[in-house]
Amino acid sequence: MDFLTLMENKLDEGRMITFEEAVELAKGKIEDEKLFLLADKLCKKNMGRRVDLCSIINAKSGGCSENCKFCAQSGHYDTGVKIYPLLDVDDVLKAAKENEKEGVHRFSLVTSGKSVSDEEFEKILGIYSVLRKETNLKLCASLGSLSYERAVRLKEAGVSMYHHNIETCREYYPKICDTHTYDDRINTVKNAAKAGLEICCGGIIGMGESMEQRIKMAFEIRELGVKSVPINVLNPIKGTPFENVRSLSPDEILRTIALFRLIMPYAHIRYAGGRMCLGEHQSKGFKAGVSAMLVGNYLTTVGNKISDDLEMIQRMGLEI
């Protein structure tokens, strides 16, 4: 019995693969198509055929105190990004309703900065209260570092999921940021989970890390009990330290997605920022383990039209 069949049998029995097994799967001895086929089978079995759709609004942009080397919104780099304060409730509500009309299931406010001020947080709570009354969207939040007390208040305001990426694995984290620690990110995830919020936590691939380090990130995310795992592909931004990083090939991106699916068989593996790097191969992700997708525009880059994404999903025989 070959190694891939052994892994398939193990996953069929509801058991989880180990780090060593995932590294073995990643070595390239197994044909991509066979790996994708197993990831797709596992995805459809555990997650069904309905693609979970979310959208975001850049509710506060630029001027961030942190020095994450990939980020256009860091105040440490000259990227030409727009800088503006927290949006008013009317602007957010308008965007939310437009996204809901397009068929989106989830909607999140995303703010720049390590965290938001007390005044901003109170305003954000008010915005979520309005969104809960005026839409049927599931509400998510991505407000940076979060205390347990704030997490409780977000849940009371109607937020069901908190997004906070670990970005990369623990050992590679010092290569991407040194104004806060990897453990700061872990603590935020744990605070949100303790308050009863579902967790959306993933990272960025293509920042110079190895495939083994991506696998380490996946296992670190798995340990956190995450429900949604956004996979972003680095979109090198001019002015950031990572502006000249080599782009990943479509095959490497898809192989990473498939491995994440095998490592986390019961979580949503979510297409997120940078999937445009796949070009005409974007639809292949839905045959390699993707079960969810961030649609519309991203924080500082433009995405596909939502209608084009919906058409792609339907073309793949999936549901919305």
From Swiss-Prot:
Alphabetized, the UniProt keywords read: 2Fe-2S, 4Fe-4S, Biotin biosynthesis, Iron, Iron-sulfur, Metal-binding, S-adenosyl-L-methionine, Transferase
- Entry keyword S-adenosyl-L-methionine: yes
How would you classify this enzyme at the top EC level? transferase
The annotation note on the cofactor reads: Binds 1 [4Fe-4S] cluster. The cluster is coordinated with 3 cysteines and an exchangeable S-adenosyl-L-methionine. Binds 1 [2Fe-2S] cluster. The cluster is coordinated with 3 cysteines and 1 arginine.
**Stored Pfam families:** BATS, Radical_SAM
Question: What residue ranges carry the coiled-coil annotation?
Answer: none
In this protein, which residues make up the domain named Radical SAM core? 46-275
UniProt catalytic activity: (4R,5S)-dethiobiotin + (sulfur carrier)-SH + 2 reduced [2Fe-2S]-[ferredoxin] + 2 S-adenosyl-L-methionine = (sulfur carrier)-H + biotin + 2 5'-deoxyadenosine + 2 L-methionine + 2 oxidized [2Fe-2S]-[ferredoxin]
Q: Which Gene3D superfamilies match?
A: Aldolase class I
User: Is Phosphoprotein one of the keywords UniProt gives this record?
Assistant: no
Q: Which family does it belong to?
A: Belongs to the radical SAM superfamily. Biotin synthase family.
User: What name does the UniProt record give this protein?
Assistant: Biotin synthase
Q: Which gene encodes it?
A: bioB
